[in-house]
């Protein structure tokens, strides 16, 4: 183990403050550190405080990881109240973050080049903060982007921005979309933020900002697998330097450390899982952002009761700033369930999905959850809501063959009833279809293990990235 000095290749990661962004970015950081680099992970002070409380992170203190170090440095988003509701108003918050972030991140990077410190060799950003590329350009530093969704979704945003493919419009809202090297996507299977009537259009504009600055990114690192999306990766590699480096959570160097990006402490549920028979438990989680209507939660609960399956259900309390109430379960639900089910506020998801008692995963189909299920060999029941989730669900069911579709997203505008929930859960856990789904899931698990093994496609791409940054920093 060496020491931190001016000769370390220094990678500075700037991450949008959200759980689904922090996890893959931190995994990338741990891998780079393990390979002998100095890595600084930066996001807003608001989220930094949550990471300190949940994981014992210490600011500015280089923590050894493998042959290198990782350190944390946070910047103030200028909103002193941790429960300020304006953080959930992205029309307000995304521009604010750019305004304050540009100045503060620039200052942080300049500081590292002074007084004999390790000057920054490369900046890495992720969606919603494309201004990091501007900072890199102004400082004459290479910039890479960590794309935390699938390559298929990347292709959709790229072609929408370039206007090379027709997408739904106000005049033709139900237009299907044919992207190069992908199956036909129905109008409700494209990333919903690109739909003209989507209520979260600000998110689409925020993501598209990355594509308007695509030429400023030397690399597009993707948390996907070359062999998972071969045709699309090849197609997109013709227009930008796409490097699949996933699944980041499976890379050994990114897992052999206690440093985690969780914003709240996970509940203990592994002993309970170990008390259940193999392939018997349904895991239910809708991620850190999705908030279902109370009546939908009721229908899921009744469907679980009717199915009789054992389940582990993550019911995360909403942030105060979100202005919504905590879900409640139907009267008598917990008494009827008994030890057949367990509710937690947060879980160690990777360990849960890897547990032998898991039968399937009822998921919102965020890309982190999708890739974790795929590469841990777990079949899924898809319950997407918006954004890339609807596209991921299409691929999980129709392309990868590991899932059953329970709904199509909020655009479907309907309540999924308890009978549908019961039928889908039973089909995914018992019988011929369940066997087929598991067979396909195990196939993708093997693909993922080969990709992250030494000499695998993702390891090669990561090595290439490190070598290029090292050459650039020497020059």
From Swiss-Prot:
EC category name: transferase
Molecular function GO terms recorded: quercetin 3-O-glucosyltransferase activity; quercetin 7-O-glucosyltransferase activity
The keyword Transferase is annotated on this UniProt entry: yes
InterPro entries: UDP_glucos_trans (IPR002213), UDP_glycos_trans_CS (IPR035595)
EC number from the UniProt entry: 2.4.1.-
Keyword field: Glycosyltransferase, Transferase
Coiled coil ranges: none
PANTHER family with a match to the protein in the record: GLUCOSYL/GLUCURONOSYL TRANSFERASES, UDP-GLYCOSYLTRANSFERASE 84A1
Family membership noted in the UniProt record: Belongs to the UDP-glycosyltransferase family.
Protein name per Swiss-Prot or TrEMBL: Putative UDP-glucose glucosyltransferase
Classification lineage: Eukaryota, Viridiplantae, Streptophyta, Embryophyta, Tracheophyta
